[in-house]
Design a protein with these regions (language model features):
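Short, contiguous strand/loop micro-motifs
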Residues: 10, 36-39, 104, 133-135
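Glycine-rich phosphate-binding loops that contact phosphosugars or nucleotide phosphates
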Residues: 63, 67-154
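A short, well-structured juxtamembrane/interface segment
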Residues: 40-55
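Cofactor-/ligand-binding subdomain signature composed of acidic, glycine-rich
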Residues: 1-37
Length: 154
């Protein structure tokens, strides 16, 4: 039987029946899974970073592309690069499906607009030194465009 990830059984079923302590312990247990998953992924992350760094040293940038909450977190992370690391705001760019409106309000079906996602990359003059990181499953659709000439009209 196919179960959507968002509909799988979780620690958050029946929240109304749990004590505050149980809820807090469940949240903490889920948070610990992030560190364990990251630890397992370090070899793949290392490989990715070792490929990105040389391109960035040649002027490449990172583009985070996402939808909904994932897109918002990408924009937030990109906005923290200048004050945290003293880097220019053009080094890591967060793009969210639905544009700036989607930062505060839901923009229904924005993640399905593959043309607009690619147009935003073209507007930023994306090139072969840049890296595009999709941070939501629905972003995969816009990544089909780079297989074509770098023009959203083709």
């Amino acid at each position: 039987m196919f179960i959507k990830i968002s509909e799988q059984p979780s620690l958050y079923n029946d929240l109304e029946k749990k004590s505050i302590r149980e809820i807090l312990e469940d949240i903490n247990a889920e948070d610990q899974k992030v560190a364990l998953a990251t630890q397992k992924a370090i070899p793949q992350i290392e490989k990715l970073v070792s490929q990105i760094v040389p391109r960035m040293k040649q002027g490449g940038r990172i583009f985070y592309m996402g939808a909904g909450t994932s897109g918002r977190l990408g924009v937030l992370d990109a906005s923290e690069i200048p004050p945290t690391f003293g880097m220019p705001p053009t080094l890591v760019i967060g793009l969210i499906a639905g544009g700036d409106t989607a930062l505060r309000n839901p923009v229904e079906n924005a993640e399905d607009d593959t043309r607009r996602g690619w147009e935003e990359l073209v507007e930023h003059h994306i090139n072969d030194k840049d890296t595009v990181i999709g941070i939501a499953a629905s972003v995969i659709r816009i990544l089909q465009w780079p297989r074509k000439p770098m023009s959203p009209s083709k």
